[in-house]
């Protein structure tokens, strides 16, 4: 699918997650469809396993649940979520044929190979393989003056920058990711409260 950033009716599926480390066994994954004029016209929710290897399928499930043919790009809050549950960008792009971009906001100081091996001795090689396949991050300076680090497939660098700038209003977080993160956090709090009330 060709990405036309200047398209008036462009729609982005922004996906974020929320969990409590050491408490949650599941992480809430929330996806919202946002138009170029920042109106929201769809959302979907699922869960993935904290420390699991099902984040990629979680993203695909969100996309499938929406059953939309008008999504022009998928935007993710990073590729490592829910405590080292690694998203496979290539698999998502190959299965959806929709351009995809993953956004992070800080340089990583972590030695990921070491953490994968220490915490997941049974499948650390798989996690490392997926992570490396995602490639290196690129720095992009936004119109707000903030810099983000991105990985992308199905789009050029100038298209990635144009897409981010179209959906940014302030700071460094694009609106589809800001809103989907708020939704995921609210749902996680609701689930925790419901669990406490049922005890």
Residues covered by each model-derived region:
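A structural signal for short, well-ordered beta-strand segments and their strand-loop junctions
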Residues: 14, 75, 101-104
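Generic secondary-structure signature for well-ordered alpha-helical cores
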Residues: 20, 64, 121, 136, ...
């Amino acid at each position: 699918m060709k990405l036309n950033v200047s398209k008036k009716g462009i729609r982005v599926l922004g996906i974020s997650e929320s969990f409590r480390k050491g408490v949650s066994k599941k992480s809430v994954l929330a996806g919202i469809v946002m138009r170029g004029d920042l109106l929201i016209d769809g959302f979907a929710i699922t869960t993935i396993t904290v420390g699991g290897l099902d984040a990629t399928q979680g993203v695909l499930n969100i996309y499938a649940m929406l059953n939309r043919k008008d999504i022009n790009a998928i935007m993710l809050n990073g590729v490592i979520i829910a405590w080292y549950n690694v998203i496979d960008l290539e698999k998502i792009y190959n299965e959806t044929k929709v351009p995809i971009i993953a956004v992070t906001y800080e340089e990583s100081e972590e030695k990921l190979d070491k953490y994968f091996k220490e915490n997941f001795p049974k499948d650390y090689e798989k996690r490392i393989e997926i992570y490396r396949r995602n490639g290196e991050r690129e720095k992009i300076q936004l119109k707000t003056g903030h810099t983000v680090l991105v990985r992308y497939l199905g789009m050029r660098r100038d298209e990635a920058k144009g897409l981010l700038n179209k959906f940014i209003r302030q700071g460094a977080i694009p609106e589809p990711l800001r809103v989907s993160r708020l939704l995921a956090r609210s749902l996680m709090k609701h689930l925790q409260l419901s669990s406490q009330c049922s005890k």
